[in-house]
Amino acid sequence: MIYRAILKRLRLEQLARVPAVSAASPFVMMAVGVFLMLMAGGVTISTTSQAFVTCGTVGLFLLLKGRKGRGVTCFLMMLSLLVSLRYMVWRLTTTLELHSPLQAALSLLLVAAELYALLTLCLSYFQMSWPLDRKPLPLPADTTDWPVVDVYVPSYNEELSLVRSTVLGALAIDWPADKLNVYILDDGRRKSFHAFAMEAGAGYIIRDQNNHAKAGNLNHALRVTEGEYVVIFDCDHIPTRGFLKKTIGWMMADPKLALLQTPHHFYSPDPFQRNLATGQNVPPEGNMFYGLVQDGNDFWDATFFCGSCAAIRRSAVLGIGGFATETVTEDAHTALKMQREGWHTAYLRQPLAAGLSTERLMLHIGQRVRWARGMLQIMRLDNPLLGSGLRWQQRLCYLSAMSHFLFAIPRLVFLASPLAFLFLGQNIIAASPFAILVYAFPHVFHSIGTLSRVEGRWRYSFWSEIYETTLALFLVRVTIMTLLNPRKGEFNVTDKGGLLQSEYFDLNAVYPNVILAVILALALVRGIGGMMWEYHDRLALQSFALNTLWVAVSLIIVLASIAVGRETRQIRHKPRVRATLPITLIDEHGQHYHAHTSDISLGGIAARLSTEHALPTQTRVTMLYHNEKDGIDVRIPAVILFSKPGQLHLQWSVDDLDVERQIVEFMFGRNDAWSNWGDFQPDRPVRSFLMVLRSIGGLFRRGQRLFRWQAPQEAPLAESEHVEEEKLEKKSLVLKPVRRSARHGATASLIVLLGLPAAIAPSLAQAPSRATPVATEQGATPVEPPPVNAPPPPSLPQPPGTLPTPPQIAPASAGELLPAATAVSLPTGPATQQMRERLSERTGVSPASPFGDTNTGALPADPSAPPIDPADAARVADGEITRTSTFRDLGLATGPLTLRGFSPLQGLDVIVPANRVVTRARITLSGALSPSLLPEASAVSVTLNEQYVGTIRVDPEHPRFGPITFDIDPLYFTGDNKLNFHFAGEYRRDCNDLYNEVLWARISDFSTVTLTTTRIAPDRKLSYLPAPFYDPNLRTPLRVPVVMPNPDAHGMLKASALVASWFGKLADFRKVSFPVSTTIPASGNAIAIGENLPIDARGTRPTGPTLSEVENPNDRLGTILVLTGRNAQEVEVAARVLAFSSDTLGAVGTKVVNDVTLQPRHPYDAPAFVPTDRPVRFGELVAASDLQGGGFAPPVMALPFHLPPDLYSWRNRPYPIDLWVRTPGGPVVDLETSRLDVHLNNNYLDSFTLKPPSLWAAWSERLVNQHAGAVEHAAALPPWLLFGQNQLKFSFDARPIDRGVCRRTPDDIHMSVDSDSWLDFRRGYHFARLPNLSYFAEAAFPFSRMADLSETTVVVPHHIDAGTAGTFMDLMGFFGATTWYPASGVQVADINDLSEHPPQGDILILATAGDAPKFEELLTRAPYELTDGHIRVGQHMGLQGIWYLFQDHDHAGLQDGVQANLNAPIAGAGVLLGAQSPYRSDRSVVALMGDTPSRMHDLVMGLRSKEDVPRIQGDLVLRNGDRLTSYRTAPTFTMGSLPWWMWLDWYLGTRPLTLYVLGLVGAGLVAAAAVRLLRRRAQHRLEEAARVKDTTDASH
């Protein structure tokens, strides 16, 4: 055993011998196995990985399917459930898209059907996991200990010819004659039945009212008979002689056993076997239930009573008030009630009786409809899942039985689902066809394959689908109506033994499926046509192919179900049964002939003679058959109808009842008569499917094709032959059976009961007073019996020789109910008294007391812009400078400005630096105006800051204009200027349509603005900071020169980090750089950082941490900001005050400052990052005015936001947005056709209507909602579209209401996105796989995890130059721009001092390639080596290619260093490298190197380039000029944490092989534990009765 092997491995094998451990081990194994299965089944992986898993599970199944044993079967069941679990998890978590009500309804309907199918599969495996295969239990040797048994044969309207055989077979049962009573329960009250009963010696019982159909009939019989056990046979079920000997043994052995059911075997073919071409080779429909399901139910002590062929303990039925009458399936409901009271049930899988199948499909459907109604009634009225008394195993078995009859709607959904795509264009499974294939195929394959193995010879693959499809459309209405009104419906008797004079096609039975087949055929044509003639991409073609295949399979199933409707001719009154029996024939001359039968029937036999001699036809012979084992010895007269050498056909000559009895005994009495009921070939799914196809072919075979709505009627009888069935009087009557010894010379013993209210049987005299009479209608009050004072009724004449008649009973009034204490008084004989005593001794109960129950960088400068003269750039003078910029240079990156009738206003920003003033300005415009415009009414007006500049006139003959130059008054200019163009256009004189295509004007993006500016003398005060170093109006990259007299002093780096990150925070999205020099620049502004720097022109030294603005000695208009102090610590204090308290410095030029106190930072609290622990309002990210716009098509509104890139959501669940939109009130905008488009990072997300809520919703919102008047929409942000820096864009596209001709359309409308809309990232967890340099490029991660970089150590060489110091400041500026927080906590370490104080946080290496060898210790976990001016893969990564085979390959564009044979020179290149920290496994090292500081500077500047950032990935990036190459070579490690269940999902989601192995281990553990527990329970079930029997025998 597995657990023993594990304990032995752990050297704990002694524990295996401890009983408690041994008993608990299967449960531990099962718990672990279930956990592993749930873990493996609940993980969603990539489609490619799932394809590998699919191949593995299918291959394993093919490997194991040929192996025998229940252990293998249990494992394959678990494997099937594992695969199906994976499929359903994938369906529920990945493939549901509910974009429209129709799609939502269709998608959810299919998912519900699939969930039902999975539930049914699980319950089927549970039921059939371990068929008990119970064997008969021997009876006591002394027959005097055998109980009295009453055999009931209920009948209502069946033909007597059908009932005779059953009664004669029951009378022939091998049982002591004085302990066997056979009763005909005739609810039809027919005199012919009464006469037959008297003739045969059977009892005969009728009642005065037919309440509750069969159940009422049985309850009435219970009250007037006394046998300890009751056996029930339907009127067509003929028992074998050994029925009681094989069943009563278990009943006697187990006093708690209330029921022992045997199979219902049918010796005539059912409609599927008879009507389908291959039906005779297919197991009957009922074989699976009686051959497998019931045997499995017996294992769980949940055997169902099936209404016939069962032995029942009388006290058990009386204890529940009789047979159930609340539903039309009284049998199953009765068993349920007994089991609720604590009684046991059992099943013997040996057919001990045989009956007739329904002859026609319509009758079969009617019978199944009744069964379905009854089981659904039980579900609604007495649900086994609720109430007390049942064990959980029994509840599941009943749930399986009840839920089975809900199949109609799911079956119809499965058949019709492809119509949604082919006819309606609805994609109800939101996945690629390949994904559907790799998930759905193993689910279907394992289900079919495992069920084929389990069901074997009892049910063939694909035939369940045919059976269900035949019934589905009839059951849909029944299912719905019964669930809604469970008390509706009556018991209907199924006709048996009918004939068909001719073949016909029963349209009445198949017309719903004919209609469905026509629809499916049209869908098939649509699918084939779509694949062949419609244009689509590969994905659409695959969708068409998949749905066409689906509809083809559905059509095959439906056609097979239609083929069943072709009813074959049936003119044989007595069905034949194949049987080979040794017989002897004696002719009229006494000659004996030995023969063997080939088939037998109640009408005759076919036999093979052992001689070639041919007997003459019409010869009378006597057939002899002797079976000593079964006690059969018959002599039956017959006539030869057909004879040829070695073969003849005989017809029985039935002269009297004794001959008929012998015929029945010969055909049905043998104990092994039906032992071959399951002799079919084991199922093979492919062969079974071919049989289905051949059956469909039979639908089109030649023959008589008569289409009828009902069965053809037999020829009418002659008028003289019309004999109406004579009926007995509608009164109660009990005819006592005649013992076999008294049958000769006496016909019957007759008891006339004109009324039953005062009769009291001894067996019911002790009935509990609380019991309500079975005949009572539900809800009625039992009526007290009237006094017995009526005169006795007259006696019927008695035949001679009958037994004495008991006293007559006073009649009851019409409609009077039978009290619990009344019954028929039978003579008290020894057998009856013995039965009473035995009942009390063995069960401890009596009828009086029955057994009881129980989850700053911007876009780089455009290369097409005109170059700036270097001389102008370097010149510093008081003179004027003239610059010319195109509209494209000014930020118009989307092409020309286009003005339309509905969007007449467009513009752009013209920025003037704060240290300059405009002295002259002009604009030069070019473009085009629509030639259809009216010149006198159309023009484009130009304004600057709402000041008029000029007008562009329309010239229809020359649509193009320009260049046109307008001078602009310099006084119009401010810092941030709005240059606007307003279009006014008309194309006709009366009225114009704003949306007409002829209303347009375009301003070229190559139009120019020319400004002449001059510098302004600075006012050097600290309160103006960050001016003049930073101008917020400028959109160009920020360049801040820095003077560091001693860049090699590491102490100055922390102060420079504060300064650089502060400017980075200010610059935000613009690039910011810090060129470092050791001397003051020749011109412009600069920042000086160092110890003891002069703070004024006189050379005064600092007296403490000092900030001072002084004139650039080389440029009188330039300013130097000095940060100094007496030591490095004071310089750092000055920098910290500048970064955190610049607004408190005052209007002074120099100030000695005091340090500021900073609160400790927490992870992920950077001001730039959107909080992930609460919803965030849009108004927290941008001003409300930025989310408003005017006109029908206002400019795009942008919502930028930053996120930590390590956000991880459960299976990439999107993050919600609650979006509120405000639109104009009144009849201005056509809200039905207007929309709002939402984009995320330039990717389209969704479109939303502007239509407001209903009037009632709008009114109610105004009472309680702060968003009253706004329209709410729900959107979602997919995680794969989110990065460190993100931008949501909102584009309104409104349409004006059509006001008719010459009605003015307002154009001054406003629309907005409410600033109280919010984003919500609370479902995200911080978890990332590192190294990932894309995270570093997007958001400086993992260093930005702490906003102040307090867990970051920058390691630099012992000696650094100004270039390296400048790169360091560039990098700190990048961090500040990313986090919007100065780097107050960053640590700077000398590589020489690192061994003494190794950093515990994240490490950033900054060095040139020449210093790379000094950093080898920090890069020991990197897969690369930097030696000899080259970077190559280290020797320790020689086996890296093997790892690469199993890693996740979702990183597009990445190369593997091993496979690429990386060996690149570093000369002229920059290197960005990520690795795991050598000091902590959850920390990172990022190295930024280059052969020169300028290469390092280029690498840092690339981190703020929108062109470069997407190309920075993996764990290594090489930059050569503008070319970036990314590599991923080393395995990744993780940073952050997840809940354990999410971590398992993530871990297995990227490791399909591990998932596969864990799933198999889990399935194996569950299977091993299940086999052990099931085997133990099977032994207990079979030994329990034997132990009780031994105990009882010992007590006697």
UniProtKB/Swiss-Prot annotation:
- S-S pairs: none
- Entries under InterPro entries matching the protein: Cell_synth_A, Cell_synth_B, Cell_synthase_bac, Glyco_trans_2-like, Glycosyltr_2/OpgH_subfam, Nucleotide-diphossugar_trans, PilZ_domain
Q: What is this protein called?
A: Cellulose synthase 2
Bilayer topology annotation: Multi-pass membrane protein
- Map out region (Catalytic subdomain A) in residue numbers: 145-238
Q: Which cellular components does GO assign to this protein? A: plasma membrane
> Where are the catalytic residues?
D187, D331
GO BP, sorted A to Z: cellulose biosynthetic process; UDP-alpha-D-glucose metabolic process
Gene for this chain = acsAII
Provide the transmembrane region boundaries.
Answer: 25-45, 106-126, 396-416, 421-441, 505-525, 544-564, 1553-1573
Write out the residues that bind substrate. D234, D236
**Entries under NCBIfam families matching the protein:** CelA
Give residue spans, biased composition: Pro residues: 783-809
Q: From the UniProt entry, list the residue stretches annotated as the region Catalytic subdomain B.
A: 315-375
Name the family. Answer: In the N-terminal section; belongs to the glycosyltransferase 2 family.
Extract one GO molecular function annotation from the record. Answer: cellulose synthase (UDP-forming) activity
Copy the domain comment. There are two conserved domains in the globular part of the catalytic subunit: the N-terminal domain (domain A) contains the conserved DXD motif and is possibly involved in catalysis and substrate binding. The C-terminal domain (domain B) contains the QXXRW motif and is present only in processive glycosyl transferases. It could be involved in the processivity function of the enzyme, possibly required for holding the growing glycan chain in the active site.
Catalysed reactions, as listed in the record: [(1->4)-beta-D-glucosyl](n) + UDP-alpha-D-glucose = [(1->4)-beta-D-glucosyl](n+1) + UDP + H(+)
Disordered as annotated region, ranges: 769-812, 828-868
Where in the numbering of this chain does the PilZ domain appear?
Answer: 570-669
Location comes to: Cell inner membrane
Origin species, per record, is Novacetimonas hansenii (Komagataeibacter hansenii)
